[in-house]
Amino acid sequence: MNDSRWTEWRILNTSSGILNVSERHSCPLGFGHYSAVDVCIFETIVIVLLTFLIIAGNLTVIFVFHCAPLLHHYTTSYFIQTMAYADLFVGVSCLVPTLSLLHYSTGIHESLTCQVFGYIISVLKSVSMACLACISVDRYLAITKPLSYNQLVTPCRLRICIILIWIYSCLIFLPSFFGWGKPGYHGDIFEWCATSWLTSAYFTGFIVCLLYAPAALVVCFTYFHIFKICRQHTKEINDRRARFPSHEAAASRDAGHSPDRRYAMVLFRITSVFYMLWLPYIIYFLLESSRVLDNPTLSFLTTWLAISNSFCNCVIYSLSNSVFRLGLRRLSETMCTSCMCVKDKEARDPKPRKRANSCSI
């Protein structure tokens, strides 16, 4: 009798929409709750680990860019920093499902929490995707129009472009609040998101046509032509070296293009990893919206695989860019020096010595 009353009470509360975010959550991988502790252990570990890595990695990128003036010589640093801030906010936003899985209440209805969280993550990842497309256009202009590049790409235009990216990303997912459908599966850790908020084939097609497809086409077009031009330049240089052994003039004339090529390769790696991690998510998004496939495990894995890209960007950049590695090393040395100075001051209490700029390269 008591069990039936409890079931009726839960059904009534579910239909009235007053369930708290911490009261109900699902285990998408299908293992259910555990008897010892009422949490989804595996899902919690994955999300907590990703949250920590994303926040720590992107904070490092932001500090290195702040302390390494040489990185600001590249106009793409505007977009890289924008991506770092967007990815940092992704990590901070991931604290919401983490707290839900650990039974910490936010005091907000589950449906509203789910919608807001899904919208914010979708907007932030849209910003990253649009920034990658703009970076590819920037490198394309730098290599194809080196003489007029400085007139075409100015700091003012870059700032305007970044503002437009944020506005566009906010607008494109706004219809999700007006019954158009679910913008993604980022909130499916909440049961209301997984069961009551459905995707729509029309809204999914709307997002693909206005965001995913244009960004992918721009990236493919620009990098195809970048590598085509680089291959032509390399062939010309090899021909000149074969004809004229003393090729100092040709080498010096080509030196101006080498940094652009190397930097284009770094950015191409970032873009490639981004789409490799996001492609399974986009494919599942299309299949599930068309009611061809419905699998909570695939939804969870593809979604958080895509979100893990927020950490991969900083790893690729730190491994591929020598200037960034130098900035990271200088930042580490500065932090170690500061720690040593504090210890020496506590031991000897000397007069503080003012430094011009402790973190500049």
Swiss-Prot record:
Q: Record's superkingdom?
A: Eukaryota
Q: Sites of glycosylation? A: N2, N13, N20
Q: Name where it mostly resides.
A: membrane
* Swiss-Prot/TrEMBL GO biological process terms: G protein-coupled receptor signaling pathway; locomotory behavior; response to xenobiotic stimulus
Which ranges sit in the Cytoplasmic compartment?
66-87, 137-159, 222-265, 318-361
The record's annotation in CDD domains points to: 7tm_classA_rhodopsin-like
Gene that encodes the chain: GPR52
Q: Where in the cell is it found?
A: Cell membrane
Q: Which organism is it from?
A: Bos taurus (Bovine)
Q: Which cysteines are joined by disulfide bonds?
A: C114-C193
As for what it does, the entry says: G- protein coupled receptor activated by antipsychotics reserpine leading to an increase in intracellular cAMP and its internalization. May play a role in locomotor activity through modulation of dopamine, NMDA and ADORA2A-induced locomotor activity. These behavioral changes are accompanied by modulation of the dopamine receptor signaling pathway in striatum. Modulates HTT level via cAMP-dependent but PKA independent mechanisms throught activation of RAB39B that translocates HTT to the endoplasmic reticulum, thus avoiding proteasome degradation.
Q: Per its record, how is this protein called by name?
A: G-protein coupled receptor 52
> Any idea which UniProt keywords this protein has?
Cell membrane, Disulfide bond, G-protein coupled receptor, Glycoprotein, Membrane, Receptor, Transducer, Transmembrane, Transmembrane helix
* One GO CC term, this protein: plasma membrane
What's a Pfam family in this record?
Answer: 7tm_1
